[in-house]
Every structure is written in C-alpha cells, then in structure tokens.
UniProtKB/Swiss-Prot annotation:
Assembly description: The cytochrome bc1 complex contains 11 subunits: 3 respiratory subunits (MT-CYB, CYC1 and UQCRFS1), 2 core proteins (UQCRC1 and UQCRC2) and 6 low-molecular weight proteins (UQCRH/QCR6, UQCRB/QCR7, UQCRQ/QCR8, UQCR10/QCR9, UQCR11/QCR10 and a cleavage product of UQCRFS1). This cytochrome bc1 complex then forms a dimer.
Protein name as it appears in the record: Cytochrome b
Membrane topology: Multi-pass membrane protein
UniProt: heme b b566 binding residues: H97, H196
Transmembrane segments: 33-53, 77-98, 113-133, 178-198, 226-246, 288-308, 320-340, 347-367
Main subcellular location of this protein, as a coarse class: mitochondrion
Assigned protein family: Belongs to the cytochrome b family.
MF terms (GO), sorted A to Z: metal ion binding; ubiquinol-cytochrome-c reductase activity
Entry cofactors: heme b
Native organism: Viverra tangalunga (Malayan civet)
Record's keyword annotation contains Cell inner membrane: no
Family annotation (InterPro entries): Cyt_b/b6_C, Cyt_b/b6_C_sf, Cyt_b/b6_N, Cytb/b6-like_sf, Cytochrome_b, Cytochrome_b_C_euk/bac, Cytochrome_b_N_euk/bac, Di-haem_cyt_TM
Length: 379
C-alpha cells in the first residue's frame, strides 16, 4: 500500500516540496534563508492580523489606536513590536538571501530569480505602506516625500501623485488605501512565494560549488528540516532579544510624535532597510535622475544574469570576484550609513562616490573580472 503522503493529492504536493525533495548534499547555512523568509512572512501575517483587529485607519485615531494596542490590549505591546521588528528580520533575511544568490550564481535560474526580484519589490512596497500606518511624524513625512517622487514622471507625474494621495496632500484617503494595500499585499507575496518555489523545484537547488549535483542528492527531510530548525531558533532568538530588550532600536524617535502637516522634521528618512536606496536617490541632484537611480538600484538585479561572463557559475573558486563582492557589501553598508545622515558636506560626496561605486561594480567590474578569471584559467 502506498504511503498516504505519496498518494493523497494535497499531501503529495507538500511531500514533494518539503519531505522527499531531492536536495544537494553540500548546501550550506546560506541556503537556510529561504525557509526563514517563509517563517517571517507567516509571523508578519499573524501579528498583522491581530494588530488589524485593534487598529483604525483614520487620521484622527490611527496614532491613538497604536498607543491603545501597546497600553490596553492584552500582550498588544509584544504583538506590535514583533510586527515592527519582524519586518527588520524579514529584510535582513532578504538581503542575505539575495546576496547568497549573487555569490553562488543562483541567478542563472532566470525564472526563479525574476520572481524573486518581483517579490523584493512587493515586500518593499508593503513595508513602506506599513511604516505610514502608525501616523507619526516620520510616517506622514516619509509618505509625503516618497509618493511625491512620482511627480518627477513627465506629463502625468502630478496627476499620478494626487491620484495616489486621493486628494491634494497625504490625508485620510491616503491612510485608508495604504492600510487596505498593506493588508492584501502579504497574501499576494505568499502566492508569489509559491510560484518562486514552483520554479525552483523545476530546476532543483543550486549548491556552493555551482556544479550539477544530480548524482549526489539527499532527501530534504530529515537533513535540511533539522538544519532549517536550527536557523529558525537563531532567528527567533535574535527577534526576541530585539523585541524584549530594545524594541525601538531600529525605529525613529520622531514616530512617537503624532503626524503634524505644519511641522517638518529636521531630517526625513525611511526605515533602515531602505536607507541604501534613499542614499542613491539623494546622491543625484536632479529629481527624475534620482528616481530612476532609485528604481535601478533594485532593478539592476534583473540584468545580472546577462552580465555573467565567467565560465564558472559560483564565486567559490573565483578570488577576484569574491573580493569585488565583499567590496559591494561594504559599499552597501556605507550607503546605508549615508542614507541616515543629514544632507551636508562630507556626506554628500561620500554618498555620490558610494553610488557610483555601486553601479560600477555591478555593471562594469563584475563582467570584467569574470573575463579576467577566464583568462587566468588558461594559464
């Protein structure tokens, strides 16, 4: 008699995705982040659902409803801080996941990679709209500044911004629609994640060496389920340390002041996970140019497969490309730091240099180093 997990239509899908899935025998801890992202998504949906039960999407009551959640709702404070800091953990895992894909050449699975880029954009949009909901000073001014960037689009820009706002400024209509989108987008993300997995399981996972591993596969369960649970324990430990000891570490103090359209904060900045893109935006004096650079800073990931010149897929045995990759990581950290600094000398110059370096590494130096390494192989 066939095992029910192999014969039942629904159980069969789960079995082929998480139990009997053939996985390379040598994948490292860098392959944990996919499952951690799934856990983060479930955590965000659950905590978000409980927050939505008590939150009111109205400019008059939004700020006080968040205060009410923290003060009066049973364990409301922990739900709120798990949701806010869960977003930070989500982005840490996302950046690690994308970085691993770049380092080990996983972008050669073009369908999986492109769905991943779409997922990244969707998660960023969701996080941005979520940041607006508490209706603090930084929420309001962040929403005003970022949505106003669309006015740089020729001809339709101003109309588009007013259409998104639902009026002539960020107001009740904006908050209501942002809440609606913030609620629905995680479910769209879940569907996209399922498609992401579907495409991945068509090709099978990549591995650190970058070579075909069909001759050396092991079942996903118990080997990688145990490995993923270890990663999950580390994630929960980090999240709970953040939530229970310093829940406001990654937030902005300005967001504890209710939104006031008549008083602009001295320095408007988004959450830390957008600072690298914000620094690139600010490094270009022209508004439209800045917006294009902002979009391209993420969209550039889509052309990485086209710029792969090396004969080897992974960077595991390519020391020059490895150096360049870690330069890129350092550059992104510098951009993140600059994004949180005021617009003054020397931060402007550092931001411009770091932005030029970012695009140069990805568009020019990576392909050149790949070609050089091909030549070195012939020596």
């Amino acid at each position: 008699m066939t095992n029910i997990r192999k014969s039942h239509p629904l159980a069969k899908i789960i079995n082929e995705s998480f139990i009997d899935l053939p996985a390379p025998s040598n994948i490292s801890a860098w392959w944990n982040f996919g499952s951690l992202l799934g856990v983060c998504l479930i955590l965000q949906i659950l905590t978000g659902l409980f927050l939505a039960m008590h939150y009111t999407a109205d400019t008059m009551t939004a700020f006080s409803s968040v205060t009410h959640i923290c003060r009066d709702v049973n364990y409301g404070w922990i739900i709120r801080y798990m949701h806010a800091n869960g977003a930070s953990m989500f982005f840490i895992c996302l950046f690690m996941h994308v970085g691993r894909g770049m380092y080990y050449g996983s972008y050669t699975f073009s369908e999986t990679w492109n769905i991943g880029i779409l997922l990244l954009f969707t998660v960023m949009a969701t996080a941005f709209m979520g940041y607006v909901l508490p209706w603090g000073q930084m929420s309001f001014w962040g929403a005003t500044v970022i949505t106003n960037l669309l006015s740089a689009i020729p001809y339709i820009g101003t109309n588009l911004v007013e259409w998104i706002w639902g009026g002539f400024s960020v107001d009740k209509a904006t908050l209501t629609r942002f809440f609606a989108f913030h609620f629905i987008l995680p479910f769209i993300i879940s569907a996209l994640a399922a498609v992401h997995l579907l495409f991945l399981h068509e090709t099978g996972s990549n591995n650190p060496s970058g070579v075909m591993s069909d001759s050396d596969k092991i079942p996903f369960h118990p080997y990688y389920t145990i490995k993923d649970i270890l990663g999950l324990l580390f994630l929960i430990l980090a999240l709970m340390l953040l939530v229970l000891f310093s829940p406001d570490l990654l937030g902005d103090p300005d967001n504890y002041t209710p939104a006031n359209p008549l008083n602009t904060p001295p320095h408007i900045k988004p959450e830390w996970y957008f600072l690298f893109a914000y620094a690139i935006l600010r490094s270009i004096p022209n508004k439209l140019g800045g917006v294009l650079a902002l979009i391209l800073s993420i969209l550039i990931l889509a052309i990485i497969p086209l710029l792969h010149t090396s004969k080897q897929r992974s960077m595991m045995f390519r020391p020059l490309s490895q150096c360049l990759f870690w330069f890129l990581v350092a550059d992104l950290l510098i951009l993140t730091w600059i994004g949180g600094q005021p617009v003054e000398h020397p931060f402007i110059t550092i931001g411009q240099l770091a932005s030029i370096f970012y695009f140069s590494i990805l568009l020019v130096l990576m392909p050149i180093f790949g070609t050089i390494e091909n030549r070195l192989l012939k020596w």
